[in-house]
Amino acid sequence: MADTAAVAKGVENLSVSASKTKELKGTEKRDTLIEIEKRYQQKWEQEGVFEVDAPSTAEFPLDAITPDELRQKHPKFFGTIAYPYMNGRLHAGHAFSFSKIEYHTGFARMQGKRALFPQGYHCTGLPIKASADKLVKEIEMFGQEFERYKEDEVVEGAAPAAAAAPKTKEDLTKFNAKKGKTVAKTGGAKYQFQILKSLGIPVSEIHKFADPQYWLHYFPPECKKDLTNFGARIDWRRQFVTTDANPYYDAFVRWQMNRLLELNKIKFGKRYTIYSIKDGQPCMDHDRSEGEGVLPQEYTALKLKVTEWAPKAAEALKGKLPEGANVYLCPATLRPETMYGQVCCFVGPALKYGVFKAAENEYFVITERAAKNMAYQGIFEKEGVIEKAADIVGSDLIGTLVNAPLSVHKEVYVLPMDTVLATKGTGVVTSVPSDSPDDCAMMTELAKKPEFYGIQKEWAEKEIVSVIKTPTSDLLAPYLVKKLKINSPKDAKQLLEAKELAYKEGFYQGIMNYGDFKGEKVETAKPKVRQQLIDAGDAFAYSEPENKVVSRSGDECSVALMDQWYIDYGEDSWRTVLYDYVENKDGKGINTYYADTQHAFKGVIGWLKQWACARTYGLGSKLPWDPNFLVESLSDSTVYMAYYTVAHWLHRDLFGREKGKGNIGADQMIDEVWDYIFCRTELSDHLVTKSGIPKETLDSMRREFQYFYPLDIRVSGKDLIPNHLTFWLYNHIALFPREYWPKSVRANGHLQLNGEKMSKSTGNFMTLDDVVKKYGADAARVALADAGDGISDSNFVEDVADNTILRFYTNKEWIEETLKDESLRTGELNSFQDALFDNEMNALVNEARKHYEETSYKLALKAAHYDFLNARDMYREACAAAGIPLHKDLVTKYIRLQALVITPIAPHWADYVWQECLGEPKSIQFARWPEVPAANPALTAARDYVRTTSSAINSAEAAQLKKMAKGRQSDFDPKKPKKLTIFATENFPTWQAKYIDLLSEVWDAATGTQKIDDKELNGRIAKMGEMKKAMPFVQALKKRLKDGEPAEQILSRKLSFDEKATLLAMIPGLKRTAGLESVQVVLVEEGSKTGKDLTNGGAEIEVTAPMAEAALPGQPSFFFTNV
């Protein structure tokens, strides 16, 4: 074994780019909070706090109570996240998805539910095996500790792959994963050992990963450690690894596949699939480093027979083809119905083409890439064999004469087109200028500049005939080119627009205007024309990936037509059931939380078809009826949530080496046992005998499934909607009774870090371990909650986590000190400071509950954390200004409520406060959500009044000083002692009466709703002639109504609180916060020159300040003077 000291410096220094993440300056407060977190994590583990079981069959016999009745007595919650793949450490993006289940589980516990959050580890498929095999080669190249690796070979941050050119038609229902994620994860590292080193694995240990099984032993414990440090409420008894490394899970997957086969959901036959020639097998989504979600695109490939070679082509091919060979240029088209209008055939002048043997005496002129696809689709004579007779450049082909099948022009010429791509189709394009704006523009260009392009003018002047008639034109492409003022093939933006318009109108509204199907709709004629061409031997089916796909082994993939086992997703009856379930019209389907998520699912259901479910390379469970194949990774991961329910009955360790509480051997888990557990069949004596499992044990496992199923929520990134999440739903519908289908799914956007995409190559990247070590678990969890909800991308902001450390530490210190404070008030609560604070806490508890129930965690955090702290601080300031201590009962109530409402998000801090500050005997993880009275609308209105009035006073002073600067005021000096006069009124201006009457007419007090829509209401207001001042007035009244203030008070033009008493109570606080020497409150009436000084017993005084007239009930006006 090599001395580690001798390892090349290049390896030792290998790292991701310098970190762009925030640098912390002091860690004492953080370290204190982390010490608390570690203490409570240990307690939770020792006490088995998160181990959750269904009610036993001893307490409730299986046949004595239905699952629904049992859940009524003992409510449950069951949530899962897509299990992570075990080829690396969890990163902050994983944590974001985990956090959603975490918060949900924590809140469910507080609702009194038995909340189950289990976790497994996905190891199936190509990635681990491919990485291990790469490592074997690298060890051969560089030595066991890579000591022969040279420093100048280090690739510190290869640039991400260039973005693909935009597609002409983008299917907005498809979510395609951006494989910049690969660069983000690897940091652009060139070799597998570099990737592993970037994960913090010592160089001396990396060689162990050449054994794929070692990955299964290394990464799952790391995953568990990271999630435990995060404070996850996971029942770790139920953890497992996939593949045949765990014989129990292996038995489960065999059952799943057997039953799908019996249901005729799995079939065998030839189908197009993305294929890696290098790997020798299909390349499914999880096997790809680029191109996740990409599907085969099927074309019609035409056979344009060469009738006369251009001189240069004849010279280039001289002696390379058999005498009398039939040679065809083979353009691939998506619009076979337009072939009647072919006027030429385009090639890229600079592109390299090959002349490939397709059959005896038959050759195709196409690109090398197209040949690779055709070789595996039964098009060439020998399967998988590419025989190239000659190479030729596109410029040599120009002027070649070819036969154009179906075209009104029997023979057409090969002409140049610079925009032909070698990476799309066959590199040969047939031209139909009647219906293709691109072709029309190019033909016009060629006819204008024949000498420039090296052609004869007449080659580009063949007559354009009408092939398709549309409502707009019989020659749609020329019409659009003229209308959009397209003057050149380089007018890309206009051409893209024209192409979209031409395709949509031609296909959906077009009528065939030429050929055997004249008069038929294009939609119905298209497949007929295609079949006619194929039957005549003038065309054949050809397929290729719709975009670039690269396997994890580095192979650019092709499409193969091959015999294989596939799951028949998209089969009509199956698809219809799923579509209806997702559409959820009757409210009994699946809840997707957001319309965008539902729309994405419906789109995928529309296009998703057969899916290859087996492969020959990688890790996994063997196909039961054909053990030469392995079940692929997106097919063994669709219903494993059901496995969670009984995993702890089967085994005690990840690999199933130690039997679980049921004392069952893996060989006893025959298909019939799974059928019984999952409520597909009833129990028989024969099954008990055959399996050797006692009836009591079988019943107990069935109880676990019956109780926890269906799954209440599944959380995953939105990029799994096109595959895993849709497969998950399809399989549940096929395998389980209706009452066990999933209830909800939440798709998240991707997580940004500090407003930028996470990427190792830029240094803007953090693992979950990094985040928790840097900020602690609770601060990280707060920042994840603050990052956002919904399907759009969210943003983890490190400043939020950093500031949370200070908030939690400071609040902890305040709580500890305040609980010891013997000067706190006792006795009755007062009607102002105490009453407002008490009411606000009640309101925030109920608001937080609502947001938790709606899984709106950013809003829940605002109510439960930020607003709770603000309410406390406002109470402290109000009491200090009034010269009174805080009330002991309210302080204790605040501390209890603050700990409880933040528990789902920040459980460590909450449990510390609960047990060590409040002295509660049991963990807060067992506490219930607090029951508090509904908020008093009058007190809520008074609280809002205090806040808005305080803010308005600050604004009023600034406005008055601004006027003074313009010469309008000269008698107020803000540097001298200040006096504030507050003008209040009890009556609304008379002009407002008619709008009050209007609102009374359209507001339904019984239901708390508006009888007419806003558009009609605004129209009626506009007709009354005072829109500018009336609209804000009506909107303010509507807001108060919607906020719950009694309608009779608002519509009778009364405030729900005593404004005069509130203003007088505010005076001490205003003096302190606004630096006032004196505050005077004057009650005024409309049109009067006098008012009542409420601060002087109601004495009548003269009112001269003009802003006195601006006062409204609930909206006082202000005037500053000097004392």
From Swiss-Prot:
Its main location: cytoplasm. It holds the Pfam family tRNA-synt_1. Gene3D superfamilies: HUPs (3.40.50.620), Isoleucyl-tRNA Synthetase, Domain 1 (1.10.730.10), Valyl/Leucyl/Isoleucyl-tRNA synthetase, editing domain (3.90.740.10). Belongs to the class-I aminoacyl-tRNA synthetase family. Keywords: Aminoacyl-tRNA synthetase, ATP-binding, Cytoplasm, Ligase, Nucleotide-binding, Protein biosynthesis. It comes from the Eukaryota. A motif ('HIGH' region) lies at residues 84-94. This is Leucine--tRNA ligase, cytoplasmic. A motif ('KMSKS' region) lies at residues 757-761. It is an enzyme of class 6 (ligase). One of its GO terms (molecular function) is aminoacyl-tRNA deacylase activity. ATP binds at residue 760. The keyword Chaperone does not apply. It is found in: Cytoplasm. GO terms for biological process: leucyl-tRNA aminoacylation; regulation of TORC1 signaling. GO terms for cellular component: cytoplasm. Its EC number is 6.1.1.4.
